[in-house]
């Protein structure tokens, strides 16, 4: 059962759930909290690798990732990031989220943006118990026109679901947590699997 708006506010008030900066009550709706787009992005460099062998030797996977991913792009205030049709890019939420060990979060895109072809997450929409950091967004433009994305715009909504008990291995306490405490548009770390 997902938390309703009153419960989300109570969890925020108690400090069990953290969202910084804290959203105003107008962005806590029914069963979700609206999140905004941050100013950090990463894109794929075109045609710098023939392919990435996802199950190949770790050093080869790492080298291929280095070739295809850009450095982090930090947009100055007021500028737009343009996502062209058929392009995949990484971005990050403006908000940093701290989820307790007995809660799981879910990220959903906004219907208004989806109707224009924008996918906010390709597949990874679960936010694990024990998570702490900003949420990386996997943008894909499946529409026909370039989309101008501006930092600060509403980009998605988080919902939260209590677990049957505290997780025995919450994300941030695991030694193998590849994205622990991320604050930027962190590229894939599949080579760390």
Swiss-Prot record:
Alphabetized GO MF terms: dCTP deaminase activity; nucleotide binding
Catalytic residues (positions): 138 (proton donor/acceptor)
Family membership noted in the UniProt record: Belongs to the dCTP deaminase family.
Catalysed reactions, as listed in the record: dCTP + H2O + H(+) = dUTP + NH4(+)
Subunit structure comment from the entry: Homotrimer.
Matches recorded under HAMAP family: dCTP_deaminase
Positions with a binding annotation for dCTP: 110-115, 128, 136-138, 171, 178, 182
Record bears the keyword Transcription: no
Gene Ontology BP terms: dUMP biosynthetic process; dUTP biosynthetic process; nucleobase-containing small molecule interconversion
Keyword field contains Nucleotide-binding: yes
Class of the enzyme per the UniProt entry, highest EC level: hydrolase
Name of this protein: dCTP deaminase
InterPro entries hit by this protein: dCTP_deaminase, dUTPase-like_sf, dUTPase_trimeric
Pathway: Pyrimidine metabolism; dUMP biosynthesis; dUMP from dCTP (dUTP route): step 1/2
Organism lineage: Bacteria, Pseudomonadati, Pseudomonadota, Gammaproteobacteria, Enterobacterales
Alphabetized UniProt keyword annotations: Hydrolase, Nucleotide metabolism, Nucleotide-binding
Pfam families: DCD (PF22769)
CDD domains recorded: trimeric_dUTPase (cd07557)
Annotated spans, Disordered: 169-193
Protein function: Catalyzes the deamination of dCTP to dUTP.
Enzyme Commission number: 3.5.4.13
